[in-house]
């Protein structure tokens, strides 16, 4: 009897060893295959690449850290090459960035991203980018299109040679062509990433609705004591904040960005010292893409966001500059009263006013399409219903007015900043930089130092943006836009 038991144990042990060996062999084989496939998909960064769209020869040298130094004879080739090289290094990141900002993640990752897509479709960053294309002309539009053409040259090459980054193979899709709108949408996303005051207004509204006035004031004591009328009005409205925003994505606050500039009068070298330390969201790969761009009349080094041409912070032969977030309140929630007989009409100045309804149907991986409409009042998109799943439309909603949803041309400013030779040219370039509002520090070879908080900020009629305001009253909030100017030496 004992012999039989021992034989069974030995047989079981052998089966376990064989099974473990097979599993281990499969794991090792898969790892080897994945490694070989990944290496095969790596872009060519040595030797000569022939691209039909280039007008003249371009040199791309990568330093010991892999940073590309691009030198060309003309603007088209410079930005075309920047787009091509960025796509070599960051195409998957670029594609996910435009998809997230556009509300198109579900198409490649499935239903888990639907609520996130609804949020970004509702906000309308891509709609704002599409409206901004008309703000660009001349050299700026030429640079944007050249950059997009460079990205597309790499996409076509990678598809043809079956060398797309391995992430595309894992997710089972190929990237669509790049466009100017994609670049501008990523720019608008940065305003989202660096903003987020509306959720504070929503929380204060909830506190006033659910807590005694004294306790609510303890949570935001800066609220003016002599403004009881607004509090009373809010008490008589009803937006379910907890339900409306339970699925929202609020950018994490990594507070503490800093930049500073010191006059040469106070430095050992006699030259200005400039330092810049912007704290943005942690990401892998980094949100920043470092590069150097050189052609006649331009020699600029620094960083930019993947998917965007130029350099957002850095230096050229004459000047250096840094950027951090100013963080002003540029968002306002409006309390909109819906017509009980027509869900697409809202009260304004004692009349029912028809809202715009935009079809933002969401494609989901696997072929499914989810119908989704975005309602836009005169103030902005209705954002308090994006996560509702088939619920009856509420009588009162929040709409969002936000400077980033206006047409603007920040990348025109960036490209002109890159070429600026002194403070006057740099400040002139900033006239096109509207959102997000940023702190710019500046230093030049001639010893000039300057600081300017630059961007569009709402001028509120009552001087306070801590709470939502009634959308049905004419000019209840907003008297225009203020542009900030600060010290210069």
Regions found by a protein language model. Give the residues of each.
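Substrate-recognition/specificity elements adjacent to catalytic centers across diverse enzyme folds
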Residues: 3, 34-273, 278, 306
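N-terminal type II signal-anchor transmembrane helix
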Residues: 8-51
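Alpha/propeptide regions of enzymes that mature by internal proteolysis
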Residues: 60, 410, 414-432
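Short helix/loop capping segments that flank catalytic or ligand/cofactor-binding pockets
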Residues: 71, 79-80, 270-271, 282-285, ...
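Sec-exported extracytoplasmic/periplasmic mature domains
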Residues: 152-160, 419, 431-438
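Short active-site loop/helix that positions an aromatic residue
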Residues: 280-293, 424-433
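Compact, glycine/acidic-enriched structural inserts
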Residues: 299-300, 305-370
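Hydrophobic alpha-helical segments
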Residues: 435-489
């Amino acid at each position: 009897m004992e012999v039989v038991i021992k034989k069974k144990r030995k047989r079981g042990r052998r089966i376990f060893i064989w099974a473990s060996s097979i599993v281990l062999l499969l794991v090792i084989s898969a790892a080897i295959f994945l490694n070989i496939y990944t290496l095969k998909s790596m872009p060519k960064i040595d030797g000569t690449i022939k691209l039909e769209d280039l007008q003249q020869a371009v040199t791309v040298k990568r330093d010991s850290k892999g940073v590309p130094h691009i030198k060309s004879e003309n603007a088209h080739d410079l930005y075309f090459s920047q787009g091509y090289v960025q796509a070599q290094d960051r195409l998957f990141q670029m594609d996910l960035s435009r998809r997230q900002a556009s509300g198109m993640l579900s198409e490649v990752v499935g239903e888990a991203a639907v609520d996130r897509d609804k949020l970004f479709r509702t906000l309308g960053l891509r709609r704002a980018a599409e409206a901004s294309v008309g703000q660009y002309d001349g050299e700026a539009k030429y640079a944007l299109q050249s950059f997009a053409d460079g990205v597309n040259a790499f996409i076509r090459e990678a598809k043809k040679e079956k060398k797309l980054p391995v992430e595309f193979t894992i997710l089972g899709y190929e990237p669509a062509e790049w466009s100017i709108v994609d670049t501008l949408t990523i720019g608008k996303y940065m305003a989202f990433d660096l903003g987020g005051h509306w959720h504070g207004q929503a929380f204060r509204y909830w506190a006033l609705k659910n807590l005694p006035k004294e306790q609510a004031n303890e949570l935001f004591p800066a609220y003016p004591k002599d403004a009881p009328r607004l509090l009373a009005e809010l008490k008589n409205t009803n937006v379910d904040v907890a339900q409306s925003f339970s699925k929202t994505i609020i950018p994490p606050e990594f507070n503490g960005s800093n930049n500073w500039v010191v006059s040469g009068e106070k430095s050992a070298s006699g030259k200005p010292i400039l330092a810049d330390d912007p704290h943005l969201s942690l990401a892998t790969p980094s949100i920043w893409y470092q590069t150097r761009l050189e052609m006649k009349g331009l020699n600029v080094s620094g960083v930019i966001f993947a998917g965007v041409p130029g350099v957002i912070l850095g230096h050229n032969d004459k000047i250096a500059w840094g950027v951090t977030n100013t963080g002003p309140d540029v968002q306002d929630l409006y309390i909109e009263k819906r017509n009980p007989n027509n869900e697409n009409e809202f009260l304004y100045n004692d009349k029912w006013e028809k809202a715009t309804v935009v079809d933002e149907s969401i494609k989901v991986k696997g072929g499914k399409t989810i119908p989704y409409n975005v309602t836009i009042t005169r103030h902005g998109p209705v954002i308090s219903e994006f996560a509702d799943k088939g619920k009856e439309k509420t009588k009162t909603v929040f709409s969002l007015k936000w400077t980033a949803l206006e047409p603007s041309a920040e990348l025109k400013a960036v490209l002109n900043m890159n070429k600026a030779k002194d403070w006057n040219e740099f400040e002139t370039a900033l006239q096109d930089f509207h959102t997000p509002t940023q702190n710019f520090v500046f230093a030049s070879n001639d010893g000039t130092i300057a600081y300017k908080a630059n961007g569009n900020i709402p001028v509120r009629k009552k001087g306070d943006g801590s709470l939502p305001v009634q959308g049905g009253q004419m000019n209840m909030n907003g008297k225009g836009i203020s542009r900030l100017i600060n010290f210069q030496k």
